[in-house]
Amino acid sequence: MARSGRYKVPFRRRREGLTNYRKRRKLVISKKPRLVVRKTNKHIIAQIVVAKPIGDETVAGADTRILTKFGWRGDENNTSAAYLLGLVVGYKARMRGVEEAILDIGLHRPTPGARVFAVLKGALDAGLKIPHGEEVLPSDERIRGEHIAEYAAKLKEENPDAYKARFSRYLQRGLEPERLPDHFEEVRKAIQQHYENKLAKIVAK
């Protein structure tokens, strides 16, 4: 409760932990499209957003559920899925004529190697130009899910029951987690081929 005339009530979205208005103002002033990354309990969402006087316009976007279109059978909320989502949204943005953007992670803590930066890495590999420091990007090994594959192989050998319980969702989808890096590469190639073909047709017109 306010106890002084100098007390300022924060904007509702700031009170609810949804928007950092100081950071948002800097992003809007840049006049560049924003790669907006948000997370839910089950999925990751990425959008290319352009600020306009009447409000934000979403130029391209998707969430990790789109990855099933390309055969993805892994988790939809891990680092590998985050990268693949960034790849998809990066290509979608380029198809709409967007070639550069700035990263908007909202109130997410900018921890190096975090999933929001895996999305960034995917968008960069799709050809978008986005200012960043290399130190924040996850390693290629982590993006490929090699840490998951190694842990799964060890657990399968030491405790098969725990392995089946821990990776039940993978196994239900027909994916052995030890194969995650190979599966990741298959899906990445499918995404690249799909969108590179579409971009080639746009350029040819």
From Swiss-Prot:
One annotated GO biological process: ribosomal large subunit assembly
Protein's UniProt keywords contain RNA-binding: yes
Keywords of the record: Ribonucleoprotein, Ribosomal protein, RNA-binding, rRNA-binding
GO cellular component, one term: cytosolic large ribosomal subunit
Residue ranges of the TM segments: none
Keyword Ribonucleoprotein: yes
Family under the similarity heading: Belongs to the universal ribosomal protein uL18 family.
Chain's role: This is one of the proteins that bind and probably mediate the attachment of the 5S RNA into the large ribosomal subunit, where it forms part of the central protuberance.
Protein name: Large ribosomal subunit protein uL18
Originating species: Pyrobaculum arsenaticum (strain DSM 13514 / JCM 11321 / PZ6)
Classification lineage: Archaea, Thermoproteota, Thermoprotei, Thermoproteales, Thermoproteaceae
